[in-house]
From Swiss-Prot:
An individual GO BP term: nitrate assimilation
Gene: napA
Cofactor note: Binds 1 [4Fe-4S] cluster. Binds 1 molybdenum-bis(molybdopterin guanine dinucleotide) (Mo-bis-MGD) cofactor per subunit.
Family according to the record: Belongs to the prokaryotic molybdopterin-containing oxidoreductase family. NasA/NapA/NarB subfamily.
Molecular functions (GO terms): 4 iron, 4 sulfur cluster binding; electron transfer activity; iron ion binding; molybdenum ion binding; molybdopterin cofactor binding; nitrate reductase (cytochrome) activity
Subunit architecture: Component of the periplasmic nitrate reductase NapAB complex composed of NapA and NapB.
Binding site for [4Fe-4S] cluster: C44, C47, C51, C79
Organism of provenance: Histophilus somni (strain 2336) (Haemophilus somnus)
Positions annotated to bind substrate: F793
Binding site for Mo-bis(molybdopterin guanine dinucleotide): 81, 148, 173, 177, 210-217, 242-246, 261-263, 372, 376, 482, 508-509, 531, 558, 717-726, 801, 818
Name of the protein in question: Periplasmic nitrate reductase
Length: 827
């Protein structure tokens, strides 16, 4: 299929029109032409929306896909990436054998990539792991994992590192995108993830998008919002806030352009407006909330020697919250007047007031959506809190059409990274490694000796790169992501650690990405429906799929790699002698035996597969996915994180947890919807001991880096519709690659003119950390205000993240990809 950009955009417009009209693409239109195709359900491989698809296979290959008409999320529709899903697996450069850098028949850091056996690869890895553990301790080895890993893979990773190698040095790329949301959810409500669901869309009167371009990043949800808005033009509004104008502005009734970081001031202004105009829900506040004050002047998560960290007063207590009161909260937000918010944000006063009145209207049901504009922020945790504040002050929460809703960018950032707990500090179901009682629960469920799991935190994502560079960490295994392209400040902080001659880097990937080619060992990985899988999407919906085709060559799933690798270690090599002395039954056993042959994971027979494909189950001799899932699910059942039984998910189109007595939960914390809220309670934020949600007072604070005379422009980065993240999958789809082959830099025409530039010119974008060569766009879909440029990071030929400052939120440790200073010159 040869699709021009014009045809591509027309096709996408037609798809959007079908969405707005509420049409469903019937199955018979897609598969009637070839009855020899076998169809089964799966989940889209891309964003966190969680669209369900039907996958068509023939002669051992995926040959077609279509939206699943029985799926509640997408109702038979898929975005343009979803329609090209079959092609992501068949790039010409697909990896099919383990590849190790070798010279003269042995591993050499400067050697050429050479095919090796899996056994040779694992023996080399195990030797490096054991050496690093001996030299540097548990944090000498680490894993950088992903919100794209399946739930089963996430469980296996967490067990291998936290229960096997006794290292909490495992962190996901969700640290770069969802950590601020997760931290703020837990701090506010005591439990992670949104209380609402996508059904809010059909109930809301107003949608407010904070730093979210849903039209391109969550197009299927946007189609539902468009349908709601266009069907009710007199009663429903769409309101969009961003630092530049993008496609979501096309539907906006109120489109607001704000200065970078000023969202904090705007949100505090709205809270002040609500109080000053008596638009708060006093009864709700008194019954269901409590007030706290946050620490201020907390730094920017940079290296300790950075002057910005040296001058910050409260770096070490960044996450501290102090008991407060409504009166103190009122006093702290009082300075954020209309005039002050306008001064900081640059937003016209009438727009600010209109937005505040929208939240204040007691008859308006409002949903606030946000993604990376709020989360990828040096004060991302604060920004999340401030959105919650507005909904808690008005009581517009945990009701159909009312609530704060953080949208995820990866298919299982929620289900795997957050719910399973593949962060350095987490265990399943919101348990954390620093609490002894939580570690004890994990040890009991995993059948481990008491006192085995460590309370020592590992290095978070950005800190892993620094630790490799500094020699504090010697081995990294990266799975299911491309951090050498996606991470921040890659020239100064990431690449040096990877090529440090004392370090050993392993990358598991289906393709020779920038990360893979920078590694020492590449492990070829099975993709998507080449394995049985499960994802958890942004609305707490857990969805399963079965393996439908086999991976090419010797490529193996991440699950197979993790579990097989565990056979190369014994407890005597990695567990403390004193624990083994007290628990002699564990002595001399492999980690495979104690983690995966523990009587729980291996209790389900392969007979249950009834002959279906499942490479991992047949290799290990038991239904490993079912065993891992049921063991993991026991963490949350009866504790507000209830999952249904394994077999139910293979029959259903997903269920939103908590699932109690076979029934999913659409809105949490509200009586009548949530089984954990008792009769008569009305609302119960039961994640908190006192069942009260936190309203937090925190101020506006400036960004870590701002434009100056030398670097006179803001740079913000993100994605576009046609490509996903680093493009390692979408750029291998010919139609998607042709539609948008290379990255561009969007710039205001006046800024271009001042620099003697015009549309289409070749330019250099230069920051204090690096530079890229690209082309300028002054006419396209993204319209930047003067003083700001926008670019994407999908293009491996440009590596835009060389420009990015590795500043993070000091509480969540999430990177700010949205704000740094650059200059633009003609190339």
């Amino acid at each position: 299929m040869n699709l021009s950009r014009r045809d591509f955009m027309k096709a996408n417009a037609a798809l959007a029109a079908a969405s707005v009209a509420g049409l469903i693409i019937p199955v018979k239109n897609v598969n009637a032409a070839d009855t020899s195709i076998t169809w089964d359900k799966a989940v889209c491989r891309f964003c966190g929306t969680g669209c369900a698809v039907l996958v068509g296979t023939k002669d051992g290959r995926v040959v077609a896909s279509q939206g699943d008409p029985d799926a509640e999320v997408n109702r038979g529709l898929n975005c343009i990436k979803g329609y090209f899903l079959p092609k992501i697996m068949y790039g010409k450069d697909r990896l099919t054998h383990p590849m190790l850098r070798m010279k003269n028949g042995q591993y050499d850091k400067e050697g050429e990539f050479t095919p090796v056996t899996w056994d040779f690869a694992f023996k080399t890895m195990a030797e490096k792991f054991k050496s690093a553990l001996k030299a540097k301790g548990p944090n000498g080895v680490g894993m950088f994992t992903s919100g794209q890993s399946t739930i089963f893979e996430g469980v296996a990773k967490s067990k291998l590192f936290k229960a096997g190698l006794l290292s909490n040095n495992i962190d996901p790329n969700a640290r770069h995108c969802m950590a601020s949301a997760a931290v703020a959810f837990v701090r506010t409500f005591g439990i992670d993830e949104p209380m609402g669901c996508y059904d809010d869309i059909e109930h809301a009167d107003a949608f407010v998008l904070w730093g979210s371009n849903m039209a391109e990043m969550h197009p299927i949800l946007w189609s539902r919002i468009s349908d709601r808005r266009l069907a009710n033009p007199d009663t429903v509004s769409v309101n969009v806030l961003s630092t530049f104008e993008h496609r979501s502005f096309e539907l906006a009734d109120l489109g607001i352009l704000l200065k970078p970081q000023s969202d904090l001031a705007i949100l505090n202004y709205i809270a002040n407006y609500l109080i000053e105009n008596n638009a708060i829900n006093r009864e709700f506040i008194e019954k269901h909330t409590k007030f706290k004050r946050g620490e201020t002047d907390i730094g920017y998560g940079l290296r300790p020697q950075d002057p910005r960290e040296q001058t910050a007063k409260n770096v070490k207590t960044a996450g501290k919250m102090y008991d407060s009161s409504f009166e103190e909260f009122k006093k702290l937000v009082a300075p954020y007047t209309l005039e002050k918010a306008h001064e900081i944000s640059g937003v016209p006063k009438e727009q600010l007031e209109k937005l505040a009145k929208l939240y204040a209207d007691p008859n308006k049901k409002v949903v606030s959506y946000w993604t990376m504009g709020i989360n990828q922020h040096t004060r991302g945790v604060w920004a999340n809190h401030l959105i919650y504040n507005i909904h808690l002050l008005t009581g517009k929460i945990s009701l159909p059409g009312c609530g704060p809703f953080s949208l995820t960018g990866q298919p299982s950032a929620c289900g795997t990274a957050r719910e399973v707990g593949t962060f350095i500090h987490r265990l399943p179901a919101d348990l954390v490694v620093i609490k002894p009682e939580h570690r004890k629960i994990a040890e009991k469920i995993w059948k481990l000796p008491e006192g085995l799991i460590s309370d020592k935190l590992g290095f978070h994502a950005v800190a892993q790169s620094r630790a490799l560079k500094d020699g504090k960490m010697q081995v990294l295994w990266q799975m299911c992501n491309n951090n050498m392209q996606a991470g921040p400040n890659i020239n100064e902080e990431t690449y040096p650690g990877w090529r440090n001659p004392d370090n050993f880097i392993v990358v598991s990937d289906p393709y020779p990405t920038v990360s893979a080619l920078s590694a020492d060992l590449i492990l070829p990985t099975a993709m998507w429906v080449e394995k049985e899988g499960a994802y958890g999407n942004a609305e707490r919906r857990t969805q399963f799929w079965r393996q439908q085709v086999k991976a090419p060559g010797e490529a193996k799933s991440d699950l197979w790699q993790l579990v097989e690798f565990s056979k190369y270690f014994t407890t005597d090599e990695v567990w403390p002698a004193e624990i083994l002395a007290k628990n002699p039954a564990y002595q001399g056993k492999t980690l495979y035996e104690v983690l995966y042959l523990n009587g729980q994971v291996n209790q389900y027979s392969n007979d249950e597969l009834k002959g279906r494909l499942n490479d991992e189950a047949y290799h290990f001799g038991f239904y490993i996915q079912k065993g891992l899932f049921e063991e993991y699910a026991s963490f949350g059942r009866g504790h507000g994180h209830d999952l249904a039984d394994f077999d139910t998910y293979h029959k259903a189109r997903g269920l939103r947890w908590p699932v109690v007595d076979g029934k999913e939960t659409l809105w949490r914390y509200r009586e009548g919807y949530d089984p954990y809220v008792k009769a008569g309670e009305g609302v119960s934020f039961y994640g908190q001991a006192d069942k009260r949600a936190v309203i937090l007072a925190v101020p506006y604070e400036p960004p870590a880096e701002v434009p100056d005379r030398k670097y006179d422009l803001w740079l913000t980065t993100g994605r576009i519709l046609e490509h996903w993240h680093t493009g390692s999958m979408t750029r291998r789809v010919p139609e998607l690659h042709r539609s948008f082959p290379n990255n561009l830099v969007w710039m205001n025409p006046n800024d271009a003119k001042k620099r003697g530039l015009k549309h289409g010119d070749k330019i250099k974008v230069i920051s204090r950390r690096g530079e890229i060569t690209s082309y300028i766009d002054t006419r396209g879909r993204n319209k930047c205000p003067e003083g700001l440029i926008y670019t994407t990071f999908f293009d491996a030929g440009q590596l835009a993240n060389k420009l990015i400052l590795d500043a993070t939120d000091p509480i969540s440790k999430e990177t700010d990809f949205k704000k740094c200073a650059v200059k633009v010159v003609k190339a």
